[in-house]
Amino acid sequence: MALNLLTVPCLKDNFAFLLHDAASGRTALVDAPEAAPVLSALAAQGWRLTDILLTHHHDDHIQAVPEIHAATGARVHGAAADAHRLPPLDHALREGDRVAIGAESAVVIDVPGHTRGHIAFHFPGSALAFTGDSLMAAGCGRLFEGTPAEMWASLSKLAALPPETLICSGHDYLDGNLRFALALEPGNPALISRQGRLSEMRREGRLPMPWTLAEELATNPFLRAPLPQMKAAVGLPQASDTVVFAEIRARKDLF
């Protein structure tokens, strides 16, 4: 049975995610930006938090761990490579490790670039991937610690997941990301459609998260770096995928 997913808006533009396994009663939180909305959502659902999964060390993803842990006693899971700058970990993770939430398990994927110790969690049985600030809706995270080559390798790993996978990322930056994507590919019908759907979601008060990987492959300029039309759009028709990705990232930084 697939896990139940609840997206929890936090802070100004962060997302946390709750995953619930009805059979076992276990519930996981992915990232901890803010305690109050998470604890309120747990109470409203009647779920008991058992696990906290952390994608990376930035404060807006971990700062509520102490309060949430104190309230719930949940086990904390995070990257072994970043243990020195994460809250105390009960389970230090490396690539390929698994985290069980009831009968379902997440596979840990190393995705350096935004930070060196960034990880993602892929739940293949539920077709879910929690990508933090690596792969984002129509975008990717800034390269605060990693290189373009590292981030491109990370995005390539995520792009190889099944296309029906729901990508759950850490922020709502979608309006700006789509404007940038459309500046590069103004005639992309998938982008035009996605912008229209986003406008509808905003009008109806629906959260624009998650999106399928198939939608990202059709609209996310960073994942589209290998395509001839994207290489032409940035004036690098013969360049490597990594070089094209780096150019797109540099342009987005200034957009």
UniProtKB/Swiss-Prot annotation:
Pathway(s) this gene product operates in, as recorded in its UniProt entry: Secondary metabolite metabolism; methylglyoxal degradation; (R)-lactate from methylglyoxal: step 2/2
UniProt-annotated binding residues for Zn(2+) 1: 56, 58, 114, 133
Disulfide cysteine pairs (residue numbers): none
Domain of life: Bacteria
Cofactor stoichiometry and binding remark: Binds 2 Zn(2+) ions per subunit.
Chain sites annotated for binding Zn(2+) 2: 60-61, 133, 171
A GO biological process held by the record: methylglyoxal catabolic process to D-lactate via S-lactoyl-glutathione
Listed GO MF terms: hydroxyacylglutathione hydrolase activity; metal ion binding
Gene3D superfamilies found in the cross-reference section: Ribonuclease Z/Hydroxyacylglutathione hydrolase-like (3.60.15.10)
Keywords carried by this UniProt record: Hydrolase, Metal-binding, Zinc
InterPro entries, per the entry: Clx_II_MBL (IPR035680), Glyoxalase_II_hydrolase (IPR050110), HAGH_C (IPR032282), Hydroxyacylglutathione_Hdrlase (IPR017782), Metallo-B-lactamas (IPR001279), RibonucZ/Hydroxyglut_hydro (IPR036866)
Residues spanning the membrane: none
Species of provenance: Fuscovulum blasticum
Protein name: Hydroxyacylglutathione hydrolase
Cofactor(s) annotated in UniProt: Zn(2+)
The family this protein is said to belong to: Belongs to the metallo-beta-lactamase superfamily. Glyoxalase II family.
Self-association state and partner proteins as the record states: Monomer.
Catalytic activity: an S-(2-hydroxyacyl)glutathione + H2O = a 2-hydroxy carboxylate + glutathione + H(+)
HAMAP family tied to this protein: Glyoxalase_2 (MF_01374)
EC number: 3.1.2.6
Function according to Swiss-Prot or TrEMBL: Thiolesterase that catalyzes the hydrolysis of S-D-lactoyl-glutathione to form glutathione and D-lactic acid.
